[in-house]
């Protein structure tokens, strides 16, 4: 029997496994194996990754420290994260000309958990695993946990210990259970165990769009996306090369080359009005979200015009940071004795910035102050 079973091998699950490794026998349960994208939602497309390492495997390596409402994080935890992930901003000689042009317009360099000396600027951070970038797989390797993949949970029973069963008849027994399957799947798993009408509510996704156009020889496709950014009150702008954007542009300019596409992501701190259902996710763009997106698009468009872009195109609204979906149900990590939740589903409101270092910080806090 395990001391702890952790459901989910993403940023939170991997951090927990690493933090618990010295004192406890730990199992990490993962639904998938090879990381694959999943997409849900109709009005706003919500993307996440299932598989070993979760969405963090295909992150852009961004590190932004921000306040987490309801959770005070000790400064030493952030210092530790910066050291463990070797977080730093790129040197000037790493920047492409397009990055430098944005900096002249008031953007700043993004700190990232990427070894810039090893990065070959393939532009494939969101689609390929590489050794230049930290991912949750690094923590999993350090954890010494028993990692069980392709485990599709069918039921979870409790009788002085937790018994997790999958659809192949496998059973895992543990004294304690931590659900860390992310903003979409954690509420679905918890719903197998308790009945609460608020499970799945309060969902946010950090809604974003990418706007851009044609700028010859900008070579943003051979750069790390979000390498430079500019932060505003409820939104941020960052350089972003998007396949969806080039598809829109090609409707008018069929022969346009990828090297000639420049884009800016507008990521907003959206309202938490979404809900995770058993087989669906509902998330609308509220009036306030629309206003925030419009302000961001207006700012981004002005920067693009200054760079020399004439025609502006935009992608559909999407979201890749689902969270908040258990914040109305779980208070301070514990559901009941021996049953916990720790991941972005606990966030009470959208961060509006890349959340990985915040999730790591939350997970470290949980192990050190609660367990």
Swiss-Prot record:
One BP term from GO: thiazole biosynthetic process
Stored InterPro entries: 4Fe4S_Fe-S-bd, FAD/NAD-bd_sf
4Fe-4S ferredoxin-type domain: residues covered: 110-140
Transmembrane segments: none
Annotated SUPFAM superfamilies: FAD/NAD(P)-binding domain
GO molecular function: iron ion binding
Pfam families: NAD_binding_8 (PF13450)
PANTHER family according to UniProt: THIAMINE THIAZOLE SYNTHASE (PTHR43422:SF3)
Protein's name in the database: Uncharacterized protein MJ1450
Species lineage: Archaea, Methanobacteriati, Methanobacteriota, Methanomada group, Methanococci
């Amino acid at each position: 029997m395990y001391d702890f079973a952790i459901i989910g091998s993403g940023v939170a699950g991997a951090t927990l496994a690493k933090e618990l490794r010295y004192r406890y026998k730990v199992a990490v349960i993962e639904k998938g194996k090879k990381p694959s994208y999943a997409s849900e939602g109709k009005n706003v497309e919500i993307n996440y990754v299932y598989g070993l390492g979760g969405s963090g495997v295909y992150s852009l390596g961004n590190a932004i420290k921000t306040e987490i409402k309801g959770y005070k994080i000790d400064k030493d935890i952030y210092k530790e994260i910066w050291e463990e992930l070797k977080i730093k901003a790129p040197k000037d000689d790493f920047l492409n000309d397009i990055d430098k042009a944005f900096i002249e317009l008031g953007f700043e360099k993004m700190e990232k958990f990427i070894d810039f000396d090893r990065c070959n600027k393939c532009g494939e951070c969101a689609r390929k695993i590489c050794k230049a970038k930290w991912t949750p797989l690094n923590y999993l390797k350090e954890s010494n946990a028993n990692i069980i993949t392709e485990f599709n949970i069918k039921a979870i029973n409790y009788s002085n210990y937790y018994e997790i069963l999958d659809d192949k008849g496998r059973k895992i027994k543990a004294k304690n259970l931590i659900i860390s399957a992310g903003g979409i799947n954690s509420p679905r798993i918890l719903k197998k165990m308790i009945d609460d009408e608020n499970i799945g509510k309060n969902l946010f996704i950090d809604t974003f769009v990418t706007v851009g156009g044609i700028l010859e020889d900008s070579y943003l496709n051979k750069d790390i996306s979000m390498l430079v950014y500019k932060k505003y009150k409820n939104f941020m702008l960052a350089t972003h090369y998007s396949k969806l954007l080039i598809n829109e542009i090609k409707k008018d300019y069929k022969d346009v080359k990828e090297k000639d596409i420049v884009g800016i992501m507008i990521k907003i701190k959206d309202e938490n009005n979404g809900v995770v259902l058993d087989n669906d996710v509902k998330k609308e763009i509220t009036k306030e979200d629309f206003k925030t997106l419009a302000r961001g698009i207006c700012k981004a468009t002005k920067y693009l015009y200054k760079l020399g872009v004439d025609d502006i195109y935009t992608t559909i609204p999407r979201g890749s940071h689902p969270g908040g979906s258990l914040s109305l149900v779980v208070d301070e990590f514990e559901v009941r004795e021996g049953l916990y939740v720790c991941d972005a589903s606990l966030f009470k409101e959208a961060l509006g910035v890349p959340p990985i270092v915040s999730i790591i910080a939350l997970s470290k806090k949980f192990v050190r102050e609660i367990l």
